[in-house]
Design a protein with these regions (language model features):
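Amphipathic alpha-helical packing segments from all-alpha helical-bundle domains
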Residues: 5, 18, 22-25, 56-84, ...
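Hydrophobic alpha-helical connector segments
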Residues: 8-42, 94-101
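Amphipathic alpha-helical segments used for helix-helix packing
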Residues: 24, 38-62
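Short, basic, alpha-helical segments at the C-terminal edge of helix-turn-helix-like DNA-binding modules
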Residues: 1-7
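Hydrophobic alpha-helical segments that form the core
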Residues: 42-48, 90-111, 124-128
Length: 129
């Protein structure tokens, strides 16, 4: 699971936000920032590494997929809490919300690796919300 330090620290911080919308906003904005940091490789190891793994890279693929699944589970749990607190409606599909954010975040990482800029990707994140 992402720690409070390092490239994925935005995940832990996002989960602490007081509302579901603020969680989603912090998560996607953090994804944009971390995948477009000056002086660092663009994209995300968790996405790129698992896509490029062949047979010999299966253990790495599995580890990175488990990491992404853990993030998705933590988002889902946070959205369930938002339902319990009345921040989201009782019929909100918390699993779908979490998977949606992960999918957008992963897409942001792929686009960043392909050369998309921070401002452009922030517009995508904003539109997704």
């Amino acid at each position: 699971m992402p720690s409070a330090e390092g490239p994925a620290a935005h995940v832990a911080r996002a989960l602490e936000e007081p509302t579901a919308r603020q969680v989603a906003t912090a998560f996607l904005s953090g994804s944009v920032r971390v995948t477009t940091r000056p002086g660092c490789p663009a994209g995300c190891l968790g996405v790129q590494g698992s896509l490029a793994a062949g047979d010999f890279g299966q253990p790495a693929h599995d580890t990175l997929a488990a990491w992404r699944d853990e993030v998705c589970s933590r988002l889902r749990d946070r959205f369930r809490r938002a339902v319990d607190e009345g921040d989201l409606t009782s019929d909100a599909d918390t699993g779908l919300l979490a998977r949606y954010l992960m999918t957008v975040s992963n897409g942001i990482a792929v686009q960043a690796a392909g050369g998309a800029g921070r401002d452009e990707l922030q517009q995508v994140a904003d539109a997704a919300l």
